[in-house]
């Protein structure tokens, strides 16, 4: 498993597509940017944003 990392902008969106796949995701910029851009997050944090 990858270590937690900072994901911002297009890197964050690409990671969500990779993690969520066909399920898609809901994009709440404030929540996910606070969680994954300002602080490092891991795959489990990203899965919380999948549909």
UniProtKB/Swiss-Prot annotation:
UniProt-listed Gene3D superfamilies: Insulin-like
InterPro entries for this protein: Insulin, Insulin-like, Insulin-like_sf, Insulin_CS, Insulin_family
Annotated keywords: Carbohydrate metabolism, Disulfide bond, Glucose metabolism, Hormone, Secreted
Disulfide bridge partners, by residue number: 8-37, 20-50, 36-41
Pfam families documented for this protein: Insulin
Compartment(s): Secreted
GO cellular component: extracellular space
GO terms for MF: hormone activity
Entry superkingdom: Eukaryota
GO-annotated biological processes: glucose metabolic process
Family: Belongs to the insulin family.
Subunit structure: Heterodimer of a B chain and an A chain linked by two disulfide bonds.
Function according to Swiss-Prot or TrEMBL: Insulin decreases blood glucose concentration. It increases cell permeability to monosaccharides, amino acids and fatty acids. It accelerates glycolysis, the pentose phosphate cycle, and glycogen synthesis in liver.
Protein's recorded name: Insulin
Organism in which the protein naturally occurs: Gadus morhua subsp. callarias
Gene name of the record: ins
